[in-house]
């Protein structure tokens, strides 16, 4: 027969009365203000930043009045990533990526802070006075309104102090967030069901002597409630060995083992009880005297006296406030075997903090009850220990999961801890926030570091979000992706230009469809001609640059006035030879050959004039239509060793991109230059590169340079001054190969010690069950983190640069009549099936 006398309704025991003006009011007249807490991302915080956060908490807590309680509550709930599989607008590769990550498990972390004002009597009561043990609760009236006003003013101060730090942000919770709405449960609903956000439904709660059960979940509670359980020393942070090297440190908060590093459903409660410090110290003085007088009867009394005296000495000499503290880890599972494993895991995590794990079964029910948001004043005093604010704050968690960018635009990377997809905007949102002043990017990664996978992954997502992408490549890295786009758009897009002797790439730098030549267009033509004329180590004088600029302007005036003259390099050469040279001879102020050797210029440029060996290059009669094509690859591997052609082809491709950029208003444009940047890294080209980067920024575009050779950037001042200094986003891949040279890289890129530590942690602790490479992304020296480039099998087969795999894909596509998408789909299924066998 059921014993109904032991059953109570939640309503009769519920300790909270109402939510008034954003404050929770308990039936014992305690006032609580609740906040959501935003912490910095995991693996991105330095020791100095941890100390700054610790200092901010300390300053904020000191403004609270006596008999206040600080209750920080960290929720860690296991969830599965839900892929957007029903989204009909996804591309083939985007859908494959969503399938790959679908149901990927991770820990969802949310942090709450409750500031409670109670009274001396409530703060001193023990577990047998908990509201859980009393009969029907009669609401009490708030008697001292002045104290409430002072507390609310202190809370405002507390909020300002915390929000003045760069690392932490707290936001007051609304009534709807606390108690919920008809459509969605609030925080209180979640606590009584131990469920994830938005899925709360109240469960039966069984509070037994040896077991606490919420619905189907059985709870286990580990507490730090006695100084005997604590380590001898504490600190704000500790070294995380798995991501550290002999040259770099990865830091985590002291409490991180019971945070995200504990892979189970759990709540980590952190309580600080702010009492009357002077009264506490006075009571300890009295205890010390009593212990001294009883010391002759027991050695333990003598030892206790010494401990109390040491506590008092530290308090008085350093001006520290005496407080009480308590910390507990509340974990749960519906499976007994899993719960047994969780108990071991929590115990191990506490042991990593050098704490003595204590599995608490005696006060589990009252501690669970005190953990109700807004009910911290119900905490049993015997479960706390005396300490100071500074050491107690070391037990606060100080980092959280990677966060999605609050932006519609971005790329999908993966969290390096769990592999959960992260939406990351490295272009628009940082510009809007002033983190960066341009969208340009510099990418450095040695061979085999996953550089091509990352760039393929990035440009594919930019393209799918409407960007115009132009790639200058020297290794067929983008052939698979380009072919896939070409096939999908039925030839309308995905254009792949390859330089061959039979079909060389040709251009017309003097062509514009409307005969409009702005200053930038004229400058780019001059830069091109100077590059054709002078070698990298030859100096260009102001007279030479000025005369060539005058010649270009005069020729442009001619073709604008007389449309019968075809704009091309041939007619420019003829104008320079037949008209401009004679005009120079007629001038009153003569220009000598030593100042501007026009004959030398004509001789050097003759090879690009009709009949010369490169006469095809600058005299194209059909202008490449870059305007409507959104994905274009120029593969110029065939000319990368040709010192005459390589710079010219690279410059003219960039010039073609700039022309495209000027005409496409309000549309994102990207030019990515792989190793081809070496062709333009000369002293003569420095101004042009700066001009390109400046122009790109003004037209909603971004220039990206990719390299794999460290020596190239260390030894080239042009790269530093023209490319690196104009790229606010820096992306580095695995640099372990260059560990001994990294100081030079650090100096060249202007990296901080924090950024260096992050970069050297790349791929140090990869999950063997997942196939991915890590990449570091730094934005303007203000934001940086390491992410995982993890792709589906379909994406892998599209991006791969491994010759045998590329041949396999192309052969299968040939068998299917050129259908590369079906070929990739078939091969991906086969490879997944083989892996599972």
Enumerate the predicted regions with their spans.
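P-loop NTPase motor core of the ASCE superfamily
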Residues: 100, 516-570, 717-837
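Short secondary-structure boundary/capping segments
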Residues: 85-90, 127-132, 374-377, 484-489, ...
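Extended, folded cores of ATP/NTP-driven motor/assembly subunits in large transport
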Residues: 1-399
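P-loop NTPase motor domains
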Residues: 47, 51-63, 355-356, 366-422, ...
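Short glycine/proline-enriched loop/turn "hinge" motifs that connect secondary-structure elements
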Residues: 23-29, 102-107, 317-322, 414-416, ...
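Short, cationic low-complexity segments
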Residues: 132-161, 353, 445-450, 798-823
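Conserved P-loop NTPase motor cores
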Residues: 427-460, 469-478, 495-503, 637-757, ...
């Amino acid at each position: 027969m059921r014993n109904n006398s032991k059953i109570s309704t939640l309503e009769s025991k519920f300790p909270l009365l109402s939510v008034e003006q954003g404050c929770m009011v308990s039936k014992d007249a305690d006032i609580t203000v609740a906040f959501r807490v935003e912490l910095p991302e995991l693996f991105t915080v330095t020791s100095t930043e941890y100390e700054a956060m610790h200092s901010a908490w300390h300053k904020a807590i000191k403004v609270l009045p006596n008999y206040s309680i600080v209750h920080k509550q960290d929720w860690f709930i296991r969830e599965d990533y839900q892929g957007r599989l029903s989204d009909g607008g996804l591309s083939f590769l985007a859908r494959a990526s969503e399938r790959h990550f679908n149901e990927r498990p991770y820990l969802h972390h949310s942090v709450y802070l409750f500031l409670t004002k109670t009274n001396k009597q409530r703060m001193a009561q023990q577990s047998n006075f908990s509201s859980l043990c009393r009969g029907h609760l009669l609401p009490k009236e708030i008697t001292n309104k002045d104290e409430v006003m002072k507390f609310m003013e202190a809370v405002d101060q507390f909020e300002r102090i915390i929000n003045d730090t760069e690392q932490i942000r707290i936001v007051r919770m609304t009534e709807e967030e606390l108690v919920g709405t008809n459509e969605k449960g609030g925080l209180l609903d979640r606590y009584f069901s131990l469920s994830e956000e938005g899925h709360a439904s109240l469960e039966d709660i069984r509070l037994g002597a040896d077991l606490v059960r919420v619905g189907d979940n059985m709870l286990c509670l580990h507490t730090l409630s006695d100084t005997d359980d604590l380590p001898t020393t504490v600190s704000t942070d500790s070294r995380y060995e798995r991501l550290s090297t002999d040259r770099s440190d990865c830091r985590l908060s002291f409490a991180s083992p019971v945070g995200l590093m504990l892979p189970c459903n759990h709540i980590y409660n952190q309580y600080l009880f702010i009492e009357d410090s002077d009264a506490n110290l006075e009571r300890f003085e009295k205890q010390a005297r009593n212990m001294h007088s009883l010391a002759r009867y027991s050695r333990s009394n003598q030892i206790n006296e010494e401990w109390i005296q040491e506590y008092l000495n530290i308090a008085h000499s350093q001006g520290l406030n005496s407080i009480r503290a308590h910390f507990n880890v509340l974990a749960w599972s519906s499976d007994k075997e899993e719960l047994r494993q969780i108990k071991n895991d929590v115990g191990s995590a506490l042991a990593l903090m050098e704490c003595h794990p204590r599995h608490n079964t005696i006060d589990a029910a009252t501690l669970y009850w005190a953990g109700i948001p807004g009910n911290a004043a119900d905490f049993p005093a015997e479960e706390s220990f005396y300490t100071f604010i500074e050491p107690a704050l070391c037990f606060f968690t100080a980092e959280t999961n990677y966060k999605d960018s609050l932006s519609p635009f971005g790329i999908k990377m993966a969290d390096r801890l769990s592999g959960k997809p992260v939406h990351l905007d490295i272009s628009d949102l940082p510009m809007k926030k002033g983190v960066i002043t341009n969208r340009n990017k510099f990418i450095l990664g040695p061979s085999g570091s996953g550089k091509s996978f990352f760039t393929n992954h990035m440009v594919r997502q930019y393209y799918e979000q409407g960007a115009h992408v132009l790639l200058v490549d020297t290794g067929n890295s983008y052939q698979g992706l380009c072919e896939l786009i070409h096939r999908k758009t039925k030839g309308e897009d995905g254009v792949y230009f390859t330089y061959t002797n039979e079909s060389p790439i040709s251009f017309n730098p003097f062509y514009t469809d409307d005969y409009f030549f702005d200053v930038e267009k004229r400058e780019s033509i001059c830069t091109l001609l100077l590059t054709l004329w002078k070698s990298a180590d030859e100096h260009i004088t102001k007279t030479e640059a000025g005369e060539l600029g005058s010649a270009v302007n005069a020729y442009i005036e001619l073709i604008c006035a007389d449309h019968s003259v075809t704009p091309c390099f041939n007619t420019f050469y003829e104008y320079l030879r037949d008209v401009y040279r004679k005009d120079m001879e007629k001038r009153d102020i003569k220009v000598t050959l030593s100042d501007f050797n026009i004959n030398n210029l004509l001789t050097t440029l003759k090879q690009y004039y009709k009949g010369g060996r490169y006469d095809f290059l600058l005299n194209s009669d059909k202008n490449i239509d870059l305007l409507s094509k959104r994905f274009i690859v120029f593969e110029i591997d065939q000319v990368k060793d040709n010192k005459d052609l390589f710079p010219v082809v690279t410059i003219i491709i960039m010039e073609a991109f700039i022309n495209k950029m000027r005409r496409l208003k309000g549309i994102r444009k990207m030019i990515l230059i792989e190793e081809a940047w070496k062709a333009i890294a000369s002293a003569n080209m420095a101004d042009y590169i700066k001009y390109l980067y400046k122009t790109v920024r003004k037209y909603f575009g971004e220039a990206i340079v990719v390299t794999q050779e460290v020596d190239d950037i260390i030894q080239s001042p042009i790269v530093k001054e023209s490319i690196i200094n104009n790229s606010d986003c820096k992306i580095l891949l695995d640099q372990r190969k260059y560990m001994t040279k990294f100081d030079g890289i650090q100096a060249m890129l202007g990296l901080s010690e924090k950024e260096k530590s992050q970069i050297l942690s790349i791929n140090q602790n990869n999950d063997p069950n997942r196939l991915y490479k890590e990449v570091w992304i730094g934005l303007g020296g203000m934001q940086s983190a390491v992410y995982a480039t993890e792709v589906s099998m379909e994406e892998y087969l599209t991006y791969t640069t491994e010759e045998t795999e590329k041949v396999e894909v192309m052969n299968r596509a040939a068998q299917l009549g050129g259908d590369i998408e079906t070929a990739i789909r078939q091969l991906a299924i086969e490879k997944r099936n083989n892996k599972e066998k």
